UniProtKB/Swiss-Prot annotation:
Biased composition (Low complexity): 186-203, 412-423
The family this protein is said to belong to: Belongs to the TrkH potassium transport family.
Cytoplasmic topological domain residue ranges: 1-46, 123-625, 714-757, 845-877, 969-1059
Extracellular compartment residues: 68-73, 91-99, 650-668, 686-696, 782-796, 814-820, 900-912, 932-945
A GO CC annotation given for this chain: plasma membrane
Taxon lineage: Eukaryota, Fungi, Dikarya, Ascomycota, Saccharomycotina
Activity regulation information from UniProt: TRK1-mediated chloride conductance is blocked by 4,4'-diisothiocyanatostilbene-2,2'-disulfonic acid.
Name of the protein this chain belongs to: Potassium transporter TRK1
Induction statement: Induced during biofilm formation. Expression diminishes when pH was altered, either to acidic or to basic conditions.
Function: Potassium transporter that mediates K(+) influx, as well as Cl(-) efflux as a secondary function. TRK1 is the major K(+) uptake transporter that regulates membrane potential and intracellular pH. The TRK1-mediated Cl(-) efflux should serve as a Cl(-) detoxification route and may play a role in sustaining C.albicans on mammalian epithelial surfaces, or in physiological saline solutions such as saliva. Mediates candidacidal activities of cysteine-free peptides, but not of defensins. The hallmark of salivary gland-secreted histatin-5 (Hst 5) killing of C.albicans is the rapid efflux of cellular ATP and other small nucleotides and ions from the cell as well as concurrent intracellular uptake of propidium iodide (PI). TRK1 is the channel for Hst 5-induced killing and histatin-5 may directly or indirectly alter TRK1 function, allowing the efflux of larger anions, including ATP, and the influx of small cationic dyes, such as PI.
Length: 1059
C-alpha cells in the first residue's frame, strides 16, 4: 500500500513539474485571438491602425483613471494623458498641483507608450507566431545549430589548410624519399632494397592556428612486394608541429633526384594548375644552389609532372607505359645504378621514382608495387649558359603583337566564370595547339595545360627568396594587366647572370567535388573569399582578390546569377545558379547558416529552397528571442538605475534637497520621475520652472542629456553597440554568438529600431551635426546675453548643449526661451519639426520591402525595369513625410488662429502667431518645449480655450505617428502567407534590380579613350553581350538610338554619360 501511494505521489509530482506553462499560455492567447480576429481584422487592417488604436486607448483610459480625483478640468486631464501617451510633454496645469496618484498614472502611461516599448512588444507577438504556427521550430533550430557546429568542428579538425590533392601530393613525395632511403641504406644487391618493407612515415607540419591535430590517411591497397614477402601498407600520420622537411628530403635533394606521378583521376572540367608544383620546384632549386659546387656547369631541378586529361603520348620524349603492371620493369635498371657501395653517384642520380595512379593500383592484381623507377630523361628543365645581355626575370617580358582588345577578349574567353554576371563555359573541343609546344616532358600523357595561367604563375614568382610568394602576389595584383598581355608562347626567362630559365610546366588538375570532396579552383575565376592555405612546406598561398571595384550600392544589390553564353551559335541564355558564390553582397558575421546565402539589398535573401527557409526561420526565431532579453534588460535597467543615481545624488546635496522639500516634493520621487521623464522623453517635471533650478549643476544636466539621447535618437546606436560588444565577447561557435551575428548582419528582419552598420553610422553623424549646429548658434547669438548674468561661462556652454539635446526630443528648458535671440528660436523651431526625421528615414530606407512600400513592384520581365530608377529612395521618403506633415500643421494653425482671434488682435508679444506656431510644432513634433506665458507655471497652451486645446491634442496624436514604419515592413509583419508573398515579390524585384544595375554599370564604362575603353577592356564580353541585347530590343521596339563605334571595328558600344 505504501509503495502504491509513493508511486502515485511521484507520478503526479513529475507531471506537475513537467508542465509546459508556455504551451498553455499560448493556447489561451490563441483561443481569445481566434474569437477577436474576425472583427479586429476589419477595424485594424494594418500596423498603423493598430498603433492609433493603442495610443487612443491609453489616452482615454488614462483620462478615466486620472479624472476622478478632480484636481483640474477634464480637458486638462485629457491634455495631460494625451501628452504622456505621446511623449509631447506640454502641460496646461502645473504638474506639482496634481496628486501623487495622478502623477503615478502619468508615469505609467509614459512608460507604456514609448517607441521602445511598443516596437519591443512586437517582438513578443512575432515570437508567439513563430512558436504557434511553425511546428517544433525551437527543436529544429537547435538541431540545425548542432549540425553546423559539428560540421565546423569537423572542418577545423581536418586541417583546412591542406586540400586533399595537396595532401596526396605530399604523401607521395614522402613515399619517394622513403624508397630512396631504403636504396641508400642497403649494402647488398639492388634486389634486396626492393624487398624491404616500408615503414610508416611521420612528418612534421606547422598549422597556423596552433591546433595539434592528428590525421590518418586512408591506407592503400595491399600489394605484394617484388620478393613476395607480403603486402606493403603505407599509413602516414602527420603531426602539425614545427615545419621541417623530411630528413631524406634534406639529405638527398640533389640535382638528379625526382619523383614522378602517373595519371590521377581527372575531374570533369578544363585543366587548371596548382601553383604548389612550381613553388616546390623553386624551393628545391634553392636548396640545390646552396650545395652545388663552384665549377658546376649546369643545374637541374625537380619537375613534378601533374595528372593530365588526354591519354596520348608525346612524340618527342620517351614515355613510360601508363598501364604497365610488369614487375620486371625495375629489373631493367642496372645494378650499378642502384648500388650504393659502388660510389657511382652519377648513375644513381639518374633514377626517377614514378608513383602509379590509384585507378591503376586498384585494377592491378595486387602483386605489383605502387611505384616504379625509370631512367630520368636528359631533357629535364635546367639552367643553360647562353650568351647575351643579362636581364631581370620578372621585369623582362617578351611581347609579340599587343592588342588590348584581342588580348582582353582572349583572356575573357579562356577564363571560366570571371567575377561578373556573365561567364563563358569552355568546351573540350577547343584547340590549344600553341600550348602543346610547351607541355612538360615528364608527363605520362600529352595533355595540354593552360599556358596562360602557367606563364602568370612563373612571372609572379621570385627565384631568389623562398617566402616571396605573398610579395609577388601583391606585385602581380598591381601589374595584372601587363602580365595578361604577355605572349603565352614565351618559353624562356633570363636571369641577371645571363642564364636562361626554361619554364616549369605543371598539369596538376585539382579534383572535383564529386570525386574527392574537394573544391574546384581556377587561378583567375575564383572570387570567393577563402582562408589562406598552406603548402606542404609551410608557405602560404593566397587567393587573389577581385580586381574590379564596385560601388557600395552595387555590391549591396548583387546576388548570384550567372549567364552561360554560347558564342558558337550566337545564342544568349541566362541561367540562374545556386551553386556559385561569386557575387555575394556580404559575408556572415557568424556561423549561423550551413550554406552561403545570396543576399540582395536590405537583407533580401534570394533563391532559397524550402530547407533553407526553414533553417533561416529557425535562426531568425532565436535572434528574436535573444533580442527580447536584451531590450527588456535595456528598458528596465535605464528606467531604474538612473533614478537610483539621482536619488543618491540629491540626498548628498543639501541645497537641492531643501529646494525639493520647500516645494512639497519628495526628493526620491523627484529623482525617479525626472529620470523616467528624461529616458522616456516625456518632458514633464515636478518643479515649476522645468530644469532652470539646475542650470549650474553639471551632474544632472549630463546624466539627463545621456538619458534623453539613448531613449530616443540614440537608442538604435547604443543597441547595436551593445550587440556588437556581446558578439565580440561571446564564446566561439555558440548558439548565443550565432544569434548575435544574425542580428548584426540582418537587423531589420527582426526589429524596426535596429539598423545595419552604415545607416547606424549615418544616424550617429546626423545626431552629432544637429546638436553641434544648435550649440554653435547658441554660442554665437546668446552666449553673452544678459539672461545668463551670474552664470559661469562653462555652465553657459553646458546649458546650450543641454538645451540642444532637449530641443528635438524631451522639451526640458534650462533657460527662458522667450528671452533668446529670434534666430535661435527659429532654429529651435526647425529642430523640433525635423526631430523624428533621422529615425523615420532610417526605419524606412532599411525596410526589407522598401520598394514595395513605395509602390515600386517587381515586373514580370527584366526588360520592363526602368534603368534610370534611383539606387536609394531617401528623396521619396522625404517627399512622403513632407506631404504627410505640412498640410496638417497649416490646418491646425488656421483653426487656432480662428479660435484665438480676439487674443491675437490684442497684439500681445507673448501671445503672437509665432508663439502659437512654436506651440503647434512642439506638439506635432512631440517635443513639449514652449515659449510660456508670464505669470503662469505651465506652457502657452494653458492660455488656450477648449477648441485650441483639442487641436493641440490632435497634433500630439498625429505627430506621434510620424516615425512609424510603412504598412509593408517585414519587421512588423507576422510570418504568414502574406509575408511569403511579399518575400517572393521582393526576390523578383532584387533580381530585376541586379540585371538593371549590371546593364547600367556596363554601359557606363564603354566610352572609348585613346586606344581602348576607359576601363582597360575589363568585362569586354559583358559589354558585347549587353550591346547585342540592346540592339535586339531596340530593333524589336522600333526605337533608334545613337551608338558610338569604338576603334576596334568588331564592337559597337553605347556611350552613356549620365550614370
Amino acid at each position: 500500500m505504501l509503495y502504491r501511494v509513493s508511486g502515485f505521489y511521484k507520478r503526479h509530482t513529475r507531471n506537475f513539474t513537467n508542465i509546459d506553462y508556455g504551451y498553455y499560455i499560448r493556447n489561451f492567447i490563441h483561443h481569445i485571438a481566434s474569437k477577436i480576429y474576425p472583427y479586429a481584422k476589419v477595424v485594424l487592417p494594418n500596423f498603423r491602425a493598430a498603433h492609433y488604436f493603442y495610443i487612443l486607448t491609453l489616452v482615454i483610459l488614462g483620462s478615466i483613471l486620472v479624472y476622478p480625483v478632480k484636481t483640474c478640468a477634464y480637458i486638462d486631464v485629457l491634455f495631460f494623458t494625451a501628452g504622456a501617451s505621446t511623449q509631447a510633454g506640454l502641460n496646461t496645469v502645473n504638474v506639482n498641483d496634481l496628486s501623487l496618484y495622478q502623477q503615478i498614472v502619468l508615469y505609467l502611461l509614459a512608460t507604456l507608450a514609448t517607441p521602445i516599448f511598443i516596437h519591443g512588444s512586437l517582438l513578443f507577438v512575432r515570437l508567439y507566431y513563430f512558436e504557434r504556427h511553425f511546428d517544433n521550430i525551437k527543436e529544429r533550430s537547435l538541431m540545425d545549430y548542432r549540425m553546423r557546429k559539428s560540421a565546423t568542428l569537423a572542418r577545423l579538425g581536418s586541417a583546412p589548410t591542406m586540400s586533399s590533392t595537396r595532401l596526396n601530393t605530399f604523401n607521395n613525395q614522402v613515399l619517394g624519399f622513403q624508397e630512396r632511403e631504403a636504396e641508400k641504406g642497403s649494402s647488398s644487391s639492388p634486389q634486396s632494397s626492393s624487398s624491404q618493407t616500408s615503414q610508416p612515415v611521420s612528418t612534421a607540419y606547422n598549422d597556423q592556428g596552433g591546433n595539434d591535430i592528428e590525421h590518418h590517411s586512408e591506407p592503400s591497397d595491399s600489394d605484394d612486394d617484388e620478393s613476395g614477402n607480403g603486402p606493403v601498407t603505407f599509413q602516414e600520420k602527420i603531426h602539425f608541429e614545427e615545419p621541417q622537411r623530411p630528413r631524406s628530403q634534406r639529405r638527398h635533394s640533389r640535382t638528379d633526384s625526382g619523383i614522378k606521378f602517373s595519371a590521377l583521376p581527372h575531374p570533369r572540367r578544363r585543366k587548371s594548375i596548382d601553383p604548389e608544383d612550381m613553388y616546390r620546384s623553386i624551393n628545391m632549386l634553392q636548396e640545390h644552389k646552396k650545395n652545388q659546387e663552384a665549377k658546376s656547369k649546369g643545374i637541374q631541378f625537380l619537375n613534378i609532372g601533374s595528372p593530365v586529361r588526354r591519354k596520348s603520348r608525346s612524340s618527342n620524349i620517351e614515355a613510360f607505359p601508363e598501364e604497365d603492371t610488369n614487375p620486371s620493369r625495375d629489373d631493367e635498371i642496372t645494378p650499378a645504378t642502384n648500388s650504393v657501395g659502388t660510389g657511382n653517384n652519377d648513375e644513381d642520380e639518374d633514377d626517377i621514382l614514378i608513383i602509379k595512379p590509384p585507378i591503376e593500383i586498384e585494377n592491378s592484381d595486387g602483386a605489383n608495387p605502387i611505384f616504379t623507377k625509370k631512367k630520368k630523361l636528359a631533357s629535364q628543365i635546367q639552367f643553360k649558359e647562353t650568351p647575351g645581355k643579362a636581364k631581370k626575370w620578372i621585369t623582362t617580358k617578351k611581347r609579340k603583337h599587343y592588342n588590348p582588345w584581342t588580348s582582353k577578349l582572349k583572356k575573357t574567353l579562356s577564363n571560366s566564370s570571371k567575377k561578373g554576371s556573365l561567364s563563358v563555359v569552355p568546351t573540350d573541343t577547343e584547340d590549344d595547339s600553341e600550348d602543346e609546344e610547351y607541355a612538360s616532358i615528364d608527363s605520362e600523357t600529352s595533355d595540354i595545360s593552360d599556358n596562360e595561367h602557367a606563364a602568370d604563375n612563373a612571372e609572379g614568382s621570385d627565384v631568389d627568396s623562398v617566402g616571396s610568394y605573398e610579395e609577388d602576389e601583391d606585385e602581380d595584383e598591381h601589374n595584372s594587366d601587363d602580365d595578361d598581355d604577355d605572349d603565352d608562347g614565351e618559353g624562356e626567362r633570363r636571369l641577371g647572370n645571363g642564364a636562361s630559365l626554361t619554364k616549369a610546366q605543371s598539369h596538376l588538375v585539382l579534383p572535383s567535388k564529386d570525386e574527392t570532396g574537394g573544391k574546384k579552383y581556377t587561378k583567375r575565376s575564383n572570387t570567393l573569399d577563402t582562408p589562406q592555405q598552406n603548402t606542404s612546406d609551410g608557405r602560404k598561398i593566397r587567393k587573389k582578390a577581385p580586381k574590379r571595384k564596385t560601388p557600395r550600392t552595387q555590391r549591396n544589390a548583387s546576388f548570384n546569377q550567372h549567364s552561360n553564353v554560347s558564342i558558337g551559335d550566337g545564342s544568349i541564355e541566362n541561367v540562374d545558379t545556386n551553386d556559385s558564390y561569386q557575387r555575394l553582397s556580404r559575408t556572415m558575421s557568424g556561423n549561423y547558416l550551413s550554406w552561403t546565402p545570396t543576399v540582395g539589398r536590405n537583407s533580401t535573401f534570394i533563391k532559397l529552397t524550402d530547407e533553407q527557409k526553414e533553417e533561416l526561420g529557425g535562426i531568425e526565431y532565436r535572434a528574436v528571442k535573444l533580442l527580447i532579453k536584451i531590450i527588456v534588460v535595456y528598458y528596465v535597467g535605464f528606467n531604474i538605475i538612473p533614478g537610483v543615481m539621482l536619488s543618491i545624488w540629491i540626498y548628498c546635496m543639501p541645497h537641492y534637497k531643501n529646494l525639493m522639500i520647500s516645494s512639497s516634493i519628495s526628493p526620491a520621487w523627484w529623482a525617479f520621475f525626472t529620470s523616467q521623464s528624461s529616458f522616456n522623453d516625456l518632458g514633464l517635471t515636478l518643479t515649476s520652472n522645468s530644469m532652470m533650478s539646475f542650470n549650474q549643476n553639471a551632474f544632472v544636466q549630463i546624466l539627463c542629456s545621456f538619458l534623453i539621447v539613448i531613449g530616443n535618437t540614440g537608442f538604435p546606436i547604443l543597441l547595436r553597440f551593445i550587440i556588437w560588444v556581446m558578439f565580440k565577447t561571446a564564446r566561439p561557435l555558440s548558439l548565443y554568438k550565432e544569434s548575435l551575428g544574425f542580428l548584426l548582419d540582418h537587423p531589420r528582419r527582426c526589429f524596426t529600431l535596429l539598423f545595419p552598420s552604415v545607416p547606424t553610422w549615418w544616424l550617429f553623424f546626423i545626431l552629432v551635426v544637429l546638436n553641434g549646429f544648435d550649440l554653435v548658434i547658441f554660442c554665437i547669438l546668446d552666449l553673452h546675453d544678459d539672461t545668463f548674468k551670474g552664470v559661469d561661462m562653462g555652465y553657459r556652454v553646458l546649458n546650450g548643449l543641454f538645451q540642444a539635446f532637449c530641443t528635438r526630443t524631451v522639451g526640458f528648458s534650462v533657460m527662458d526661451l522667450s528671452q533668446l535671440h529670434a534666430a535661435t528660436q527659429v532654429s529651435y523651431l526647425i529642430m523640433m519639426y525635423i526631430s523624428v526625421l533621422p529615425i523615420a528615414i532610417s526605419v524606412r530606407r532599411t525596410n526589407v520591402y522598401e520598394e514595395q512600400s513605395l509602390g515600386v513592384y517587381a515586373k514580370e520581365n527584366a526588360e520592363g525595369v526602368d534603368e534610370s530608377a534611383p539606387s536609394n529612395y531617401v528623396g521619396s521618403h522625404l517627399r512622403n513625410q513632407l506631404s504627410y506633415d505640412l498640410w496638417y500643421i497649416c490646418l491646425g494653425l488656421f483653426i487656432i488662429c480662428i479660435a484665438e482671434g480676439k487674443r491675437l488682435k490684442e497684439q500681445d508679444l507673448r501671445f503672437s502667431i509665432f508663439a502659437v506656431l512654436f506651440e503647434i510644432v512642439s506638439a506635432y513634433g512631440t517635443v513639449g518645449m514652449s515659449m510660456g506665458y508670464p505669470g503662469v507655471d505651465c506652457s502657452l497652451s494653458g492660455e488656450f480655450n477648449v477648441i485650441s486645446k483639442l487641436v493641440i491634442i490632435a497634433m500630439m496624436i498625429r505627430g506621434r505617428h510620424r516615425g512609424l514604419p510603412y504598412t509593408i515592413d517585414r519587421a512588423i509583419m507576422l510570418p504568414n502567407a502574406a509575408m511569403k508573398r511579399h518575400d517572393r515579390l521582393q526576390e523578383e524585384h532584387a533580381i530585376n534590380r541586379h540585371n538593371t544595375m549590371e546593364r547600367t554599370t556596363t554601359l557606363g564604362r564603354v566610352a572609348t579613350f585613346g586606344n581602348g575603353p576607359i576601363d582597360g577592356g575589363n568585362n569586354l564580353l559583358t559589354r558585347a553581350i549587353t550591346n547585342i541585347e540592346h540592339r535586339l530590343r531596340n530593333r524589336r521596339d522600333g526605337r533608334s538610338e545613337s551608338s558610338t563605334v569604338s576603334e576596334d571595328p568588331r564592337y559597337v558600344v553605347r556611350t552613356v554619360s549620365e550614370v
